[in-house]
Each structure stands twice: as C-alpha cells, then as structure tokens.
Amino acid sequence: MEARTPGAKLAGPGEHVFDMHKVNQIMGGPGYSPVFGGCVEGERMIVALMRYPAGKPSDAHSHPNEQWIYVLEGELEMEFDGKWYRGGPGHCFYVPANKVHKARNEGARDCVFFTCKDASHGLHGKKA
C-alpha cells in the first residue's frame, strides 16, 4: 500500500512514533504553495509539520478534504472569501472541504505549523 500523497510516509503496522523533522520532507502544495515539511499518513488521517518561508504567498487553491492548521512559530495569514485572518502561536485555522483559500507569511521569519486532514484525499489540493 502506498501513501495517497506522493513522497509522504505511510504509517505501517507497529509504527506509533514519528520524528516529523526526519520523515520524508515534501512540498505541501506543489505548484501553488511554498510550504514544505514532514508528512505522515495513517488509515484515516494525514498529519504534517510544515514550514512556511517568510515573504512567500500561496496561490488560491482548494482540496476535497477539510483541514486544521495549528500555528507553532511565527505568523500566518489566510484569506477566505476576500477577508484576511491572522494567527500566531496557539492559533488554529479551520479550512472546510472544497473551500477556496490562500495564505501568506509576511513576517520576517518562517512560520511553522502542524496540519491535519482527513485521508479521504491526499495532502495536496489543486490551484483555483
């Protein structure tokens, strides 16, 4: 069995702990987003520890699975329906399934966030 997301680590039988800094480092949104980091897929959930480079915007995109984004370091801004929302460490963004959105990091340093999606689809979405 292979991971739904190209390059992601697939959790196997008996695997219970993952060093997210050492699992396969992949692009979080090839062709539309500059984020990258470690990604692990289970049977029903996908988790990733991502780094969003400072000064880099994403293009508008969507994905058929819902997503949670928990900011650990730096600041992240996300746009939904023309309105921008900002969150720093401890803030959590919710992205409904199929919701077109975009993000940016206008801070002076990278943003690090933990993200979780249901595994009905892979980590990657599609450019809007």
Language model segments and positions:
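Short beta-strand His + acidic residue motifs that chelate non-heme Fe in jelly-roll/DSBH
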Residues: 58-60, 78-79, 95, 101-107
